[in-house]
């Protein structure tokens, strides 16, 4: 079981209990919950408030499976590779020339993960696309979904209802140094 915050701090409690989910049920994520998760994304900080990101939402299973197939083939992954078979994926992309693109998308993705946790929805960060976006077969697939040619997909947000309680691994708390 995950450690919970006992001070009634909902934000800290979400941070302490959020874990990556790698098995989902077939229960769909509602449009209302998806809109709430996406609102959390667009209110994330971005360098110089540039907000040059795009969040591409893919809800149809066959489209998710097709993208996973292209990634699987490009990376020579096993046939079982499927982004953990989520109900929804959100591609977090940003302009290639934005030096803050990765950090901006990471902030937005963390907001989505925490909002999903608050709504009882499981999530996982999939990071394979960043290195292969410009492979011809991958770029063609991304183009079908409306990802601009000048964007890198820095991460994929998997969403769905957890098929099982995610495992809470012990955290290393010996990483903080006060240099007063």
Per-segment meaning from a language model:
Residues 4-180:
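Acidic, surface-exposed loops and disordered segments
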């Amino acid at each position: 079981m995950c450690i919970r915050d006992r001070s009634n701090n909902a934000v800290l409690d979400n941070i302490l209990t959020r874990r990556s989910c790698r098995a989902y049920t077939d229960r769909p994520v509602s449009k209302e919950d998806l809109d709430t998760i996406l609102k959390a994304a667009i209110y994330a900080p971005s360098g110089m408030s540039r907000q040059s990101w795009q969040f591409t939402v893919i809800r149809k299973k066959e489209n998710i499976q097709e993208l996973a197939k292209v990634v699987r083939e490009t990376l020579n992954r096993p046939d079982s590779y499927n982004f953990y078979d989520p109900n929804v994926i959100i591609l977090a992309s940003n302009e290639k020339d934005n030096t803050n693109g990765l950090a901006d998308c990471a902030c937005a993705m963390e907001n989505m993960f925490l909002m999903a946790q608050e709504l009882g929805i499981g999530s996982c960060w999939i990071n394979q696309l960043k290195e292969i976006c410009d492979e011809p077969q991958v770029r063609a697939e991304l183009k079908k979904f409306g990802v601009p040619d000048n964007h890198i997909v820095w991460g994929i947000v998997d969403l769905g209802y957890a098929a099982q309680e995610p495992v809470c691994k012990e955290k290393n708390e010996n990483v903080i140094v006060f240099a007063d």
